Amino acid sequence: ATVVAAGSHSLQIAKELGYGEDMSLLPVAGSFFIADDQLLNGKVYTLQMKKLPFAAVHGDAEVHDDSITRFGPTAKVVPGLERGRLSSVPDFFDVFGFTPEAFLSYANIMADRILLPFVLENLLYDLPVIGRKQFLPHVQKVVPSVELEDIERATGYGGIRPQIVDTANKSLDMGEAKIVGDDIIFNITPSPGASTCLKNAMRDTHTLLESLEGDYEFDEDAFREATIGHFPRADADDDTIAVDAVESAAADD
């Protein structure tokens, strides 16, 4: 039994093994801006547009240094499976497939009157000088007092979110994708963050145990205690907060 959790490359591997033939990817690179000040003590989201599968811009304190507040992500469509690696461009074309269905799917997606302006706008955010100015209004929705000189583009943050393209329906899937094959699972998750990765781990473990026909057991209580048992709680007597963080498999990462 095998779990393939290779990020953007999971679908590439799946295709090489004969799975996911009706799927392609729209790789989306996310960048962040930071403020060298503790402006927030939690995660604050702007309004999510229903038709956009990308996480809404949000602000939160940096995990390793709460004196820094980060805002993002942006969502720039790129022809590669890894951020900053030109060597992953051929990998993207492997996943793309060069089929009529793939070309028609991308054309249909990019012709959308909501998605196309969004994609074009996000191309500006990585540009010197004007990128910061263009992104500032999104930051001010979270913290209205922030000025242009308070933020700068962060380095070393962000990666690639592999958004699934359904080439059969010529559409962009709004969530994560999972291909379950013969004793193998391929995880293609746009945002395998803290809550989503733990939920995936529990779900995949149960699936794998079924294929192992009772030879092994999974102590889910011990798993929860070792992971979400350490999550901060608003009320020390309320265990449901941490559990809900995983059960939701949230899109908040």
Residue spans of the language-model regions?
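Mid-to-C-terminal Rossmann-like scaffold of FAD/NAD(P)H-dependent oxidoreductases
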Residues: 56, 114-115, 248
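Long, low-complexity, intrinsically disordered segments
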Residues: 247-253
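Flavin-dependent oxidoreductases
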Residues: 1-91
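Residues that form generic nucleotide/phosphate-binding pockets
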Residues: 16, 138, 142, 226
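C-terminal catalytic lobe of FAD-dependent flavoproteins
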Residues: 95-218
